[in-house]
Curated annotation (Swiss-Prot):
CDD domains: RNase_HI_prokaryote_like. It holds the Pfam family RNase_H. Endonuclease that specifically degrades the RNA of RNA-DNA hybrids. GO terms for biological process: DNA replication, removal of RNA primer. Its EC number is 3.1.26.4. It is an enzyme of class 3 (hydrolase). Keywords: Cytoplasm, Endonuclease, Hydrolase, Magnesium, Metal-binding, Nuclease. Mg(2+) 1 binds at residues 9, 47, 69. Binds 1 Mg(2+) ion per subunit. May bind a second metal ion at a regulatory site, or after substrate binding. This is Ribonuclease H. PROSITE patterns: RNASE_H_1 (PS50879). It comes from Moorella thermoacetica (strain ATCC 39073 / JCM 9320). It is found in: Cytoplasm. It catalyses: Endonucleolytic cleavage to 5'-phosphomonoester.
Length: 152
């Protein structure tokens, strides 16, 4: 099974507001950068969207080390939040509907093809790949504002 390292990040200009995401995929000496934007979204949705997009681009099942500076994204897997939400019919412990449920369900489906290790990195620090993802996300927002990226 191929081993792939992925870095992801999401950003929002206003929350909610125009948002972007970036991802860097590394396999051996190969590297791929992805990004996208939405006209009205939240930073949390962009964090999840980055992971979905990165995992979706993998053509076969892989062993993935996915790094994100989003505690929300990483802890949903590492702390068992997603499993608990599913068991509880997508309700929080306070019996409220889970936010971003559409994206969480999509991420679970896409991630199920792979062996994913969810890893937290410190945001806006000295990690060049995480910093690059942030640059990609912010550039996607800027491009959206210039109408260079069609919104989905």
């Amino acid at each position: 099974m191929k081993e792939v390292t992925i870095y992801t990040d999401g950003a929002c200009s206003g929350n909610p507001g125009p948002g972007g995401w970036g991802a860097v995929l590394i396999y051996g000496d190969k590297r791929k950068e992805l990004s996208g934007a939405e006209p009205s979204t939240t930073n949390q949705r962009m964090e999840i969207t980055a992971a979905i997009a990165a995992l979706r681009v993998l053509k076969e099942p892989c062993r993935v080390h996915l790094y994100s500076d989003s505690a929300y994204l990483v802890n949903a897997f590492r702390q068992g939040w997603l499993a608990r939400w599913e068991r509880n019919g997508w309700l929080t412990v306070k019996k409220q509907p889970v936010e971003n449920q559409d994206l969480w369900r999509e991420l679970l489906q896409v991630a199920s093809r792979h062996q994913v290790e969810w890893l937290k990195v410190k945001g806006h620090s000295d990690n060049p790949e995480n910093n690059r993802c942030d640059e990609l996300a912010r550039a996607a927002i800027a491009a959206l504002r210039r109408q260079e990226i069609p919104s989905s």
